[in-house]
């Protein structure tokens, strides 16, 4: 179990967004399941150590890289799923947000 995204919350979201498990593997819902990941734009991916979907994010970063795409990936091991909105209350979350913004800026130049 991870806070704040736990099994009950994940089940709620899945049941709401994917009734009867329809479209769980649709590329827009699960980009890592896309059959062709080649020739995509550069990606900046940040995953969190305490996140039930961390492994999916890590696998997606590896799959993009294996397909020949430019990928910048950080796993912020001490953070939770919601770290992107916690920058004002957590120094570690703030540092993670700054790092991701700097990485994204490199690709946007």
Give the role of each language-model region:
Residues 1-109:
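Alpha/beta-hydrolase superfamily serine-hydrolase fold, recognizing
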